[in-house]
Amino acid sequence: MESERAAYAFLPQTPIKSTDAHLVEFSEAMRAVAKTLRQVAEGKAAAQAEAAEWKRKYELEKAVKAHRHNTVTKGCSNCDKEKLEQLASQLTLETTSVDPTSCCGNHEICSRQILQDECPGTNKISHDKIAARKAPFKLSWGCNGDNNGQHKHDFVSFEKGDITTAERSNKQILLKWESPPQTVLFVTKPNSNSVHALCAEMVRWLKEHNNINIFVEPRVSKELVTEDSYFNFIQTWDNDEEMKTLHTKVDLIVTLGGDGTVLWAASLFKGPVPPVVAFSLGSLGFMTPFSSELYRECLDHVLKRPFGITLRSRLQCHVIYDSAKNEVDTEEPILVLNEVTIDRGMSSYLTYLECYCDSSFVTRVQGDGLIISTTSGSTAYSLAAGGSMVHPQVPGILFTPICPHSLSFRPLILPEYVTLRVQVPINSRGQAWASFDGKGRKQLGPGDALICSISPWPVPTACLVDSTTDFLRSIHEGLHWNLRKSQSFDGPVA
């Protein structure tokens, strides 16, 4: 805000002596006013973000209900009132919460059955069904390799003055379909002939052997249909509004590429993300455990049998511009799967940032920049900057400086429930630039702030074996972690 800028600009210009009580009192009052104005701005930003989220949910539900009504009316114009009401009741969107213990037992998590409808204009072919539902599934815990859905709960007990924790168990999350998946979305690496050929082959195989509905990106749809009229059955979306309801139609996502393709697929979903099966066709593949040569066996297993998943946390970010309007830059939060990077861009000055964790001051960053990363992104830019590699299912936020101007500035790992605020001070000499998963750069000037917290919508990725085995395999094969020659041993001296 302009008043806060003026307050901070006035303070260093006014010489304050310890003997001048009036100036000391005035300086403290100005600082208190600036702090209060900043808190008001942050509160307004949080309220706007919450209102935007509720607005998005309302518009989504309204669009689905409106389309459902149009579909029912069009398909039953000659039906009587009683039959119409009966059909409408069968297509009711289920939005009420379900007690997990009543439908799945104490050790499983049910998916909500969400109405799957066809968006008008997305496909010109007629379909046999008026509407279909997404395939419901259950999430259960695997215990020490046993897929029976039972596990030991972690708890802390206090007995006879001693605090003890229960024995921990392997908690691999398993996904089991309650009905066969009906719709698969393909997300592919662009400008690759081999990926394009494999995508066409996989789409043909899924349609002929499993009768799966196929969604692809508009770019891929145009390429496939131009190449062969056989692919006229594939579906796509025409605008952002249709893309917002994509998660209500898609049961499974298949990515063909590297980690960048997985990041792009996750960015298409601003809310819930369907399970992702990632095939490795890129350079490094920390999130792509499946081999494209065995796609038939892999997809057959994922579509018909339980499989392990890794819930990869995402960060939700808001940019607050300290301007006269003092409004959040975007109505919806920016979701990132790897990291948010704040650097100095083209500026010749060091980046100067003030960092807060909830309401507690953390530190001031002076250096090339700062990385706020998820645990999935710990093997990306954060690792190159000296951060630790962290298992993707460890809940936390990585706080990694980039070339800090201090030998004691070491990386941190913070709990996942905190909210981080990184702001450019009013008296900063230069500006900063924020990028989100390597794209969408935004300029941050003096007084601007970036708010980051863990999103409630993770990205579930399918495991080849289990989350731990896949993670260790990726750092061994992808990074050649701790690879060295073994020390020779010639036996004891005689």
Curated annotation (Swiss-Prot):
Record keywords, A-Z: ATP-binding, Kinase, NAD, NADP, Nucleotide-binding, Transferase
EC top class named in words: transferase
GO MF annotations in UniProt: ATP binding; NAD+ kinase activity
One GO process term, biological-process aspect: NAD metabolic process
Annotated catalysed reactions: NAD(+) + ATP = ADP + NADP(+) + H(+)
Superkingdom of the source species: Eukaryota
EC number(s) on file: 2.7.1.23
SUPFAM superfamilies, per database record: NAD kinase/diacylglycerol kinase-like (SSF111331)
Family: Belongs to the NAD kinase family.
Stated name of the protein: Putative NAD kinase 3
Organism: Oryza sativa subsp. japonica
